[in-house]
Curated annotation (Swiss-Prot):
Family: Belongs to the TER reductase family.
Gene Ontology process terms (BP): fatty acid biosynthetic process
Summary of the function given for this chain in its UniProt record: Involved in the final reduction of the elongation cycle of fatty acid synthesis (FAS II). Catalyzes the reduction of a carbon-carbon double bond in an enoyl moiety that is covalently linked to an acyl carrier protein (ACP).
Protein origin, superkingdom: Bacteria
Protein source organism: Vibrio cholerae serotype O1 (strain ATCC 39315 / El Tor Inaba N16961)
Positions of NAD(+) binding: 48-53, 75-76, 112-113, 141-142, 250, 279-281
Coiled-coil stretches: none
Statement: the UniProt record of this protein carries the keyword rRNA processing: no
SUPFAM superfamilies given in the database record: NAD(P)-binding Rossmann-fold domains
Pathway: Lipid metabolism; fatty acid biosynthesis
EC assignment: 1.3.1.9
Self-association and partners: Monomer.
A Gene Ontology molecular function term of the record: trans-2-enoyl-CoA reductase (NADH) activity
UniProt-recorded name of the protein: Enoyl-[acyl-carrier-protein] reductase [NADH] 2
Amino acid sequence: MHIKPIIQGVVARSAHPYGCEQAVLQQIQYVKQANPIKSGPKRVLILGASSGFGLAARIALTFGGAQADTIGVSFERAPSETQTGSAGYYNNLFFKQHAEQAGRIAVNLEGDVFSVDMREQVIEAIETYFEGEVDLIIYSIASGMRRKPRSEKADPEFWRSAIKPIGEAVSGATLLLENDTWIETTLQPASEEEIEGTLRVMGGDDWENWIDTLINAESLAEGCKTIAFSYMGPDVTHPIYLDGTLGRAKIDLHQTSHALNLKLANFDGGAYAVVCKALVTKASVFIPGLSPYLLALYQVMKNKGTHEGCIEQMQRLFSDKLYGHSRIPLDSERLIRMDDWEMNPDTQVQVRERLQQMNASNFQQLGDYAGFKREFMQLNGFEFDQIDYSQSVDMHNFINKK
């Protein structure tokens, strides 16, 4: 099969297997030469392990000094004779291959992270591969929906997340990657049902359920930590993000971290929400109004030499903040701030200046659109110089592989 990029709006409909491997390899190469993680965790569970921060965390902990064994949970689309499947499928496959070559355990579990069945599979895997205990649980789920538990069965049977403002409509620009155009959009405010749905899918509810399940199964090691990822951003992004449905869910996540921290104190451990920097991920390109900010931010931070991708963020999180130090640096709300370089005052002044001038005719010049789009393409295995995209790919090498 000849695999070409297929983009509809901001969604990639194809993925290149060997390009995805290249993305994994580049992240492995980065962490091997970076400041190493000291006194890191040895047995790690990653819920949402196939892309973005979850995948980067898995790579950093395996290859960046901690030499961790990992169990990764994700929900990805497998390839067929006619379809390439999703990038996350190949990320999982190639991560496992390279981790095992390095002598590490890498277990991939495919399925619905919200389900009771997956909790049972994970506990069984912890018993089998980790002698019954984990040292770190990473919660990195970006999902559009969550099946309601049996106890709350109602119509409809799913909670659905909606990226919308709360209270009043918000206007902003979205970049359509399929034809490189700037589209002005207005988002109507969320209904109460949409606010509740987003809170249930993207908030701390399921994270807490997972930790409770693992405590009850006696699967937490002494000193066990758990983290989940959040974003806050500057004022310019607040109407659509922090003040909207996503922000409501993230604040719930922060509150959950405090409740879980009390529970993990019994294990001499801790729970933390990690506020990351704004990045191009499969999830972030969906957020209307965020793309122009990302373009300006990328341009300014690259000019200053402070730009980080997911892998740089995760390596710095584990080596500089979470492990190897007597105290974990927290802000006044007990959050770990990995957006510290993004929120640098001078950086934000320069970003705001660019944003005020940015429009449909100049966004490619004022912002780092080339870098933004290249990063998006590389999430799906495209635009790597090392890959010959004219070569046909034999999909039989990947169908039914685990």
